[in-house]
Amino acid sequence: MKITVLGAGVVGTAAAYYLAADGHEVTVIERHAAPARGTSQSNAGLVSPGDATAWASPAALKTFLRGLYNHDLGIKVRLRFDPYFLAWSLRFLRQCTVARLRANSQVKLRLALYSRDCINAISADTGIHYDERKKGILYFFRSQHSLNTGTDNYRYLAEHGLPIEIVGRDRLVELEPGLAGVKEKIAGGVYSPIDQTGDSRLFVDNLAAYASEKLGVKFLFGTTVEGLDIQGDRVRAVMTSAGPVTGDAVVISMGPESGLLGRRYGIDLPVYPVKGYTATIPLEDESKGPTIGGADEDQLMAYSRLGNRLRLASTAEFTGFDRTHKPSDFTTMFRTARDLFPGAFDEKKAELWAGLRPMMPGSVPVIGQARYKNLYLDTGHGHVGWTMACGSGKFLADLVAGRKPEIDPQGLVYGG
């Protein structure tokens, strides 16, 4: 078939790779001048099944309300008139029960574990590299209370297949010597040995080049999707700034813009943008920086080591489609990073960035055929798009081919 994929981020590019590997003629439409220049450009760098716990939980409402007035928190809510945000919030709150938290987290973990294996298989099959480190990730807590509360979620994930190690201070510093200076400030943590880190933009750049050169995938960069030409129960063409693109099937993988396009054609797709901030800094003294990825769970800041660079990531800000940033947005992030890794970097040399996560109310992405016979979704991966993208792409390719997916599809296949 001729398949058109909308979006060349990590999700869309992974889908294009697997579809082309199945023998389809694939065209990818991307508004930016290169792949992975939107949501996938500068994420936390974590491939983290250990971060599969859904955002919606019984504690989420309290955190949400605190985010209205305390902008030093990792969660920020900017009040504005936005009917879509109100509707999304109500659906989010309906997911904030213990039962939904567990169900959503279990689905996310299933896909995340599968996707991690898919990433490694792609790397082995294609020979591409992306500053990857396969040394695990540390999730640590500064107080005994947060440690006791936080480890409950990890224990639940462990019950469903995630290998973890609950670690005290001594073991934590053994795993990450870079944290020796703050050992007494940390109560303990969780080590997920199968988690890993890597530069998603570099991965996508290399995968797109491979897909183009070896599999014949055609990328239309600098091309904006303007709409869909619907005839009856099928999409006849994708209308773009460069003219119509016809084909036998269409895949929507447009990140936070997916919901905007879907709603125009009667598709219930509650994807809402949640802004995040990252800083990428060259390490001045590599011996003082981290050797593996980590997350300060009390400060809500994640970090990864990407070659000789340090990637910092923080904040979940509900502010619509605003992608702007200013130096003060990074103040808390830099303060936390200086505390953890003093002398490792010079923040004046940081490359600052802000992007939008495509969040579903339950934190679970949607994959599969939607409303029209030849229209498919692969979107809504939220804060773990890098983690889930390759598994989603392979899962989607199986659905398109009519094959039985390699993982249980319950909770993943679109039903709207």
Swiss-Prot record:
Task: Kindly indicate whether the keyword Nucleotide-binding belongs to this entry.
Answer: no
Flavoprotein as a keyword? yes
Q: Which UniProt keywords apply?
A: FAD, Flavoprotein, Oxidoreductase
- The record lists the membrane-crossing segments as none
Q: Name one Pfam family in it.
A: DAO
GO CC annotations?
cytoplasm; plasma membrane
Q: Which GO terms describe its molecular function?
A: D-amino-acid dehydrogenase activity
The cofactors it requires, by name, are: FAD
Which GO annotations describe the biological process of this protein?
Answer: D-alanine catabolic process
Query: Origin, by domain of life?
Result: Bacteria
| E.C. numbers | 1.4.99.-
Read off the InterPro entries from this record. Answer: DadA, FAD-dep_OxRdtase, FAD/NAD-bd_sf
Where does this protein hold FAD? 3-17
UniProt-listed Gene3D superfamilies:
D-Amino Acid Oxidase, subunit A, domain 2, FAD/NAD(P)-binding domain
Reactions it catalyzes: a D-alpha-amino acid + A + H2O = a 2-oxocarboxylate + AH2 + NH4(+)
HAMAP family associated with the record:
DadA (MF_01202)
Q: Its biological function?
A: Oxidative deamination of D-amino acids.
Instruction: State the family named in the UniProt similarity comment for this chain.
Output: Belongs to the DadA oxidoreductase family.
Task: Tell me the protein's name.
Answer: D-amino acid dehydrogenase 2
- Record the organism: Mesorhizobium japonicum (strain LMG 29417 / CECT 9101 / MAFF 303099)
Query: What phylogenetic lineage does the species belong to?
Result: Bacteria, Pseudomonadati, Pseudomonadota, Alphaproteobacteria, Hyphomicrobiales
